[in-house]
């Protein structure tokens, strides 16, 4: 592996979402987004709900992630997410329908969490 690259694995309980060498990442941490470049300091952090951006050259790959952990060590990045989806695996029309139905429900913490996850998947699918 080149010293200018990051070895990245993004894994959910269902499948390996991404595996490869990349130039940089933008990760949705539980306390906010943070960037990862080669030679980043070692770190273990929790993931929030959000968009994970993976950049390799001019190509940008986006995924939705819903919690989990990220570990950075020696240019190797392991992302374990509770649930994740690649842009191409998200059905935009289904997510829009889910959003419309959820917005009709009475306020609750579970509704807010569902809305946040659904809106993230819609953003990923729309990019």
From Swiss-Prot:
Listed under GO biological process in this entry are: proton motive force-driven ATP synthesis
Q: What is the official name of this protein in its record?
A: ATP synthase epsilon chain
NCBIfam families, alphabetically? ATP_synt_epsi, PRK13444.1
GO cellular component, as recorded: plasma membrane; proton-transporting ATP synthase complex
Where is this chain's protein located in or outside the cell? Answer: Cell inner membrane
Alphabetical list of InterPro entries matching this protein: ATP_synth_F1_dsu/esu, ATP_synth_F1_dsu/esu_N, ATPsynth_dsu/esu_N
Q: Quaternary form?
A: F-type ATPases have 2 components, CF(1) - the catalytic core - and CF(0) - the membrane proton channel. CF(1) has five subunits: alpha(3), beta(3), gamma(1), delta(1), epsilon(1). CF(0) has three main subunits: a, b and c.
Sequence similarity? Belongs to the ATPase epsilon chain family.
Keywords attached to this Swiss-Prot or TrEMBL record, sorted alphabetically, are: ATP synthesis, Cell inner membrane, Cell membrane, CF(1), Hydrogen ion transport, Ion transport, Membrane, Transport
Q: How does it sit in the membrane?
A: Peripheral membrane protein
Task: Output one GO MF annotation.
Answer: ATP binding
Q: What is the recorded function of this protein according to its Swiss-Prot or TrEMBL entry?
A: Produces ATP from ADP in the presence of a proton gradient across the membrane.
Signal peptide range equals none
In terms of SUPFAM superfamilies, this protein maps to: Epsilon subunit of F1F0-ATP synthase N-terminal domain
Mind telling me which PANTHER family this protein's record contains? ATP SYNTHASE DELTA/EPSILON CHAIN (PTHR13822), ATP SYNTHASE EPSILON CHAIN, CHLOROPLASTIC (PTHR13822:SF10)
Q: Which domain of life is it from?
A: Bacteria
């Amino acid at each position: 592996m080149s010293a200018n690259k990051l070895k990245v694995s993004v894994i959910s309980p269902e499948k390996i979402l991404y595996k490869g060498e990349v130039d940089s990442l933008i990760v949705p941490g539980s306390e906010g987004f943070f960037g990862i470049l080669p030679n980043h300091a070692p770190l273990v952090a929790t993931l929030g709900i959000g968009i994970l951006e993976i950049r390799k050259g001019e190509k940008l790959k986006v995924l939705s992630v819903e919690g989990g952990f990220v570990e950075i060590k020696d240019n190797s990045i392991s992302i374990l997410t509770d649930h994740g989806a690649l842009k191409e695996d998200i059905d935009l029309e289904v997510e829009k329908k889910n959003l419309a139905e959820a917005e009709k429900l009475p306020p609750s913490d579970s509704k807010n969490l569902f809305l946040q996850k659904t809106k993230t998947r819609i953003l990923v699918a729309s990019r």
